[in-house]
Amino acid sequence: MSKKLKPFEILEDSCASVCIWLNGEPTAISNRAENLWNKAKYRVATDGAVNEILKRKSFVEWPHIICGDFDSINKQIDTKNAKVVHLPDQDYTDLSKSVQWCLEQKTLTSWEFENIVVLGGLNGRFDHTMSTLSSLIRFVDSQTPVIVLDSRNLVLAVPTGDSNLDVNLEMTTKMCGIIPIVQKETIVSSIGLKYEMENLALEFGKLISTSNEVTTSQVFLKSSSSLIFSIELENWVYKLDSL
């Protein structure tokens, strides 16, 4: 059975999401991201992100949860009424630990949410960017979608098998990438792209699909392994110029 993916739901006001604010380049958090953060049902900040949130305190809400190993937070910062969650495991990144903790709350507590939206994680240090993509692949089979939003892109992992992606064409430049992130040859077929693939072998160091283009609001992907799907947002979307 084909898996239905609706990543653009996170940009709707009615979407009940967890927002995770990552430490990273300040420019990665756009006006749109701030708006999503303020409207999120649950706001979760990694410890390093608290310093940046504090700088924006006049126009962003304080987090409900602050989590991490607390090696990046300014020790003088008052956590106020946020719940502090220590996640000291050094084998995983703050993002992976935060996503795992949120998914556990959905199972163990009364938390209810439709998506996990990650703010940032694609700008700045390259190794941090790769760790973000690794985290997406780690949770690709979760029943709760994990979607990364930075100052220009919307990025998610696509699972093995058949997937149908709903794309809001008006919100994008239509430029997209289908990246075989796993370290093995990945066989991909597609419907709804300018440069279609039919049982095409994608692999790092060989052929990958970048600067492709979405042509319809429904994109079908069939893959032998997990993929990263990225799409570029229109300027007005992430800058909120239209609101």
UniProtKB/Swiss-Prot annotation:
EC number: 2.7.6.2
Key words, A-Z: ATP-binding, Kinase, Nucleotide-binding, Transferase
Alphabetical list of InterPro entries matching this protein: Thi_PPkinase, Thiamin_pyrophosphokinase_euk, Thiamin_PyroPKinase_B1-bd, TPK_B1-bd_sf, TPK_catalytic, TPK_catalytic_sf
A GO molecular function held by the record: ATP binding
GO biological process: thiamine diphosphate biosynthetic process; thiamine metabolic process
Keyword Metal-binding: no
Record flagged with keyword Membrane: no
Mutagenesis / variant outcome for changing C67Y: In qm162; maternal-effect mutation. Partial loss-of-function. Prolongs embryonic and postembryonic development, increases lifespan, reduces brood size, reduces the rate of pharyngeal pumping and increases the defecation cycle rate
Domain of life: Eukaryota
CDD domains, per the entry: TPK
Residue spans crossing the bilayer: none
Pfam annotation, one family: TPK_B1_binding
Pathway: Cofactor biosynthesis; thiamine diphosphate biosynthesis; thiamine diphosphate from thiamine: step 1/1
Catalysed reactions, semicolon-separated: thiamine + ATP = thiamine diphosphate + AMP + H(+)
Protein role: Catalyzes the phosphorylation of thiamine to thiamine pyrophosphate. Functions cell non-autonomously.
Similarity comment: family membership: Belongs to the thiamine pyrophosphokinase family.
Record protein name field: Thiamin pyrophosphokinase 1
Taxonomic lineage from the root: Eukaryota, Metazoa, Ecdysozoa, Nematoda, Chromadorea
